[in-house]
């Protein structure tokens, strides 16, 4: 029998959300045996339901933390793993064992305004409400109680070191089921994509930080002949109706063909990744950048801004100067030229990207996961 980990989070977030997706991959690594010498003895979470603001706050601040403490005392695990920093207040004040917290990003802990060539972008929330300010103080205190922070990227680890230099940290990236996405093994049926168009995929919410509006502006400035061949496919579960309306109006004004998919099933997302001509990911800041690695694992060309943490994953040829419109326009023109030269809607999978994505397999990340757990056990 291996050492026993108790996994803890708040609500049971779906895999269509970043935190939910990362929690799911953590569970899969542990249950598949990829984290050698470790097993899950339980998960502590609660349903996401509309119980009213007061009840939700009472559960978040009082009843759920008490439940975590009680279950930890009853099960006596070797380690408690809280799988995202938004639940760091759940670190028990009297823990029977070491506690690690996965830190995805610190945008809400250390919000700022970023000045870019595309204008000012708010990273996080510079004006949280009264209860959120109290909540953030609780989260920071909880994170300070942890024995180790597991950061999902080097960019996040560097950020953590600037605001919590005394908290030990280790980098364990998110893992991806690379075999499931590999088109050489599991090619999905081509979605309904017009045969003679250039299909460009964007994945993310409508938050300005994700910079989907930047993509629309870049494409809108291309020559008519090229722009008219492009279809932008927008996928993202976190939908803001007002922001969605603004982006659609912006696309219409710029004469950009925007196809709004919204939330899609995982199989449909993989099919788009495998058959679109490229993923465009111009985000201003990321804790990791799941869509980039997942597209790479699908053999899909990617273009990203040279900003953390999405620039940690692809080869240099896929990384563009941040918010430099001319560079992005040139890259898209090149994609169009390659599409015309192929003379076919079939795009050969990018083997170099498949190889790069293999570094995020469950087996490789599982070994890093094991090192993190073993490190905190030895240091306790």
Please report, for each region that a protein language model flagged, where it lies by residue.
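Short alpha-helical donor nucleotide-sugar binding micro-motif in glycosyltransferases
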Residues: 143, 271-276
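Membrane-proximal helix-turn-helix segments that form the acceptor-binding/catalytic region
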Residues: 124-149
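Conserved acidic donor-binding segment of nucleotide-sugar-dependent glycosyltransferases
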Residues: 318-343
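Aromatic "clamp/platform" in nucleotide-sugar-dependent glycosyltransferases that forms part
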Residues: 284
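Active-site donor-binding segments of glycosyltransferases and PAPS-dependent sulfotransferases
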Residues: 4-91, 251
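Glycosyltransferase donor-sugar binding loop
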Residues: 176, 203, 229-245, 262
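Nucleotide-activated donor-binding/catalytic signature segment of Leloir-type glycosyltransferases, i.e.
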Residues: 244-267
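Short hydrophobic beta-strand element within catalytic cores of glycosyltransferases
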Residues: 292, 297, 301-304
């Amino acid at each position: 029998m291996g050492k026993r980990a108790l996994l803890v989070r708040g609500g049971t977030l779906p895999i269509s959300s970043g935190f939910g997706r990362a929690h799911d991959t953590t569970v899969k690594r542990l249950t598949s045996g990829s984290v050698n010498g470790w097993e899950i003895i339980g998960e502590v979470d609660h349903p996401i339901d509309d119980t009213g603001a007061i009840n939700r706050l009472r559960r978040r601040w009082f009843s759920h933390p008490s439940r975590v403490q009680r279950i930890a005392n009853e099960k006596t695990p070797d380690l408690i793993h809280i799988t995202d920093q938004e639940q760091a207040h759940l670190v028990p004040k009297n823990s029977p064992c070491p506690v690690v917290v996965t830190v995805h990003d610190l945008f809400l802990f250390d919000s700022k305004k970023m000045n870019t060539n595309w204008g000012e972008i708010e990273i996080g929330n510079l004006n949280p409400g009264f209860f959120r300010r109290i909540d953030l103080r609780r989260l920071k205190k909880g994170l300070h109680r942890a024995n180790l922070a597991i950061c999902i990227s080097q960019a996040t680890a560097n950020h953590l070191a600037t605001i919590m230099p005394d908290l030990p940290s280790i980098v364990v990236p998110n893992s991806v089921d690379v075999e499931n996405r590999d088109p050489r093994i599991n090619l999905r049926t081509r979605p309904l994509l017009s045969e003679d168009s250039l299909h460009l995929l964007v994945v993310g919410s409508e938050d300005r930080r994700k910079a989907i509006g930047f993509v629309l502006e870049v494409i809108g400035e291309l020559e008519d002949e090229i722009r008219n061949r492009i279809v932008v496919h927008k996928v993202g579960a976190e939908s803001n109706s007002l922001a969605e309306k603004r982006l659609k109006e912006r696309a219409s004004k710029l004469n950009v063909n925007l196809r709004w998919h919204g939330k899609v099933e995982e199989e449909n997302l993989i099919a788009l990744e495998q058959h679109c001509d490229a993923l465009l990911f111009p985000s201003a800041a990321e804790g990791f950048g799941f869509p980039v690695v997942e597209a790479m694992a699908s053999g899909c060309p990617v273009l990203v801004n040279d900003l953390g943490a999405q620039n940690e994953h692809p080869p240099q040829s896929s990384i563009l100067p941040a918010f430099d419109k001319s560079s992005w326009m040139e890259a898209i023109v090149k994609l169009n030229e390659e599409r015309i030269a192929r003379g076919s809607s079939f795009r050969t999978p990018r083997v170099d990207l498949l190889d790069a994505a293999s570094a995020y397999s469950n087996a490789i990340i599982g070994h890093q996961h094991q090192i993190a757990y073993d490190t905190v056990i030895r240091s306790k």
